[in-house]
């Protein structure tokens, strides 16, 4: 039982398959793309998982095991608001079969942190155009129209 622990805990990928039962006592599982953000994040009633960018099969299987054993949990993903962040989220949804919702990867967040956004490169535009007809259409259209992207490290959660 880890519910009373404060702070981070690391579990080796090598033992994830050996874990038989995972009971999440909070309401949410939140996956995070970047390590800096993971270390600085506290999200009440959430089990937070660091993905390290593109997730591997071991992490995906662990997440699927959590979903199977905790069917009422909400799954969120917090990543960069750029083409890479949305590709990671789309890949996570496809490979796990879980309906992850983007967390703070929206127009409101881009507007709030406008001073920290960066301009899109030509490659960013190409990649975003390929994603524009996905479930993330609203934020991607905004990014293309306003020539902006945002690293998740600029966003304050705590």
Residue ranges and their predicted role:
Residues 1-50, 55-69, 84, 91, ...:
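Nucleic-acid enzyme cleavage-core boundary/entry regions
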Residues 47, 99-101:
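Conserved beta-strand segments of alpha/beta enzyme cores
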Residues 73-82:
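Acidic beta-strand-to-loop metal/phosphate-binding motif
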Residues 101-107:
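RNase H-like polynucleotidyl transferase catalytic core
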């Amino acid at each position: 039982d880890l519910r009373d622990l404060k702070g981070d805990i690391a579990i080796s990928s090598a033992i994830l398959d050996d874990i038989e039962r995972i009971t999440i006592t909070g309401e949410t599982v939140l996956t995070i793309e970047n390590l800096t953000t993971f270390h600085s994040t506290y999200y009440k009633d959430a089990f937070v998982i660091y993905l390290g960018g593109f997730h591997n099969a071991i992490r995906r299987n662990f997440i699927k095991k959590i979903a199977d054993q905790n069917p009422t949990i909400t799954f969120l993903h917090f990543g960069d608001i750029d083409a890479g962040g949305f590709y990671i989220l789309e890949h996570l949804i496809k490979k796990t079969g879980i309906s992850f919702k983007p967390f703070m990867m929206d127009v409101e967040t881009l507007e709030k942190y406008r001073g920290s956004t960066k301009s899109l490169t030509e490659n960013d535009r190409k990649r975003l155009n390929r994603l524009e007809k996905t479930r993330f259409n609203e934020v991607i259209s905004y990014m293309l129209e306003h020539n902006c992207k945002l690293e998740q490290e600029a966003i304050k959660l705590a």
